[in-house]
Amino acid sequence: MTDDVTNVEQPSTASEQQPQDVPAAEPSAAKKRRANKAKSKATAAAIEQRLGHSFADPSLLTTAFTHVSALKSARRTDSYQRLEFLGDHVLGLIVSDMLYRAFPDADEGELSKRLADLVRKETCADVARSLDLVEGIKLGTVGAGAGAKLRKSVLGDICEAVIGAIYLDGGYEAASDFVRRNWTERMRKPARSLRDPKTVLQEWAQARGLPTPVYREVERTGPHHDPQFRVAVILPGLEPAEGLGGSKRAAEKVAASAMLAREGVGTGGNDG
């Protein structure tokens, strides 16, 4: 008699089971990058709202906030420095136009003093703080370690770079709107509170161990009854700055104001 053998299917071992499709966990580095990207986008949107300008080219805004210390490469042109250069001159033009229209009775000496005070680094830094632009500054360990976020020079640079970025993105009118919104009240500062630019420049030079500034007449043009003087102010280690005026003294003041503005020194108080 043959024994009946019952074929019973044995359960498969774990090694024989087919793996189920389980979503792979996102790598922590990728999650961090995605979170940082979302945060940067939100920060940029908030800054645009405070600036009153929506960028068609967001890369301009990013560059305007990038300190050279944040760059991994040696390409300094990827930092805000080029935009700062442009913004400095755009700001000077717009503020000069504002002053010319607002003070029709002021001579070139007074206008120059006001201009130097309004475009100095400290004023730009004050605008940057009022708009909370420090939030978007991108710094490397070098800058952050030195507290660069809070340094007046960095904030002033950022403000000028933002003006340059707005100018490139939206043109002169967009840049002018931004400057007028943020400089009109500052422009109304009483002129008597502004110090003589030649005195300020001399004190600034002496504080840095430099000799007394030298003023040299470069040229004299125009008729005898209405001459125009071009004067250069010279300090060792610095590029000369020039000024025009109806008298040598007026031209010297303009030249001193030009050097002060370039070096980020104002005439409204004590600058370090």
From Swiss-Prot:
Its GO biological process annotations read:
mRNA processing; regulation of gene expression; rRNA processing; tRNA processing
* Molecular function as annotated in GO: double-stranded RNA binding; metal ion binding; ribonuclease III activity; rRNA binding
Instruction: Kindly list the cofactors needed.
Output: Mg(2+)
E.C. number: 3.1.26.3
Q: Membrane-crossing residues?
A: none
Ranges for domain DRBM? 196-265
Annotated region described as Disordered, given as residue ranges: 1-38
Keyword annotations for this protein, in alphabetical order, are: Cytoplasm, Endonuclease, Hydrolase, Magnesium, Metal-binding, mRNA processing, Nuclease, RNA-binding, rRNA processing, rRNA-binding, tRNA processing
Looking up InterPro entries in the UniProt record yields:
dsRBD_dom, RNase_III, RNase_III_dom, RNase_III_sf
User: Quaternary arrangement and interactors, per the entry?
Assistant: Homodimer.
Indicate what this protein is called per its UniProt record: Ribonuclease 3
Q: Which organism is it from?
A: Rhodopseudomonas palustris (strain ATCC BAA-98 / CGA009)
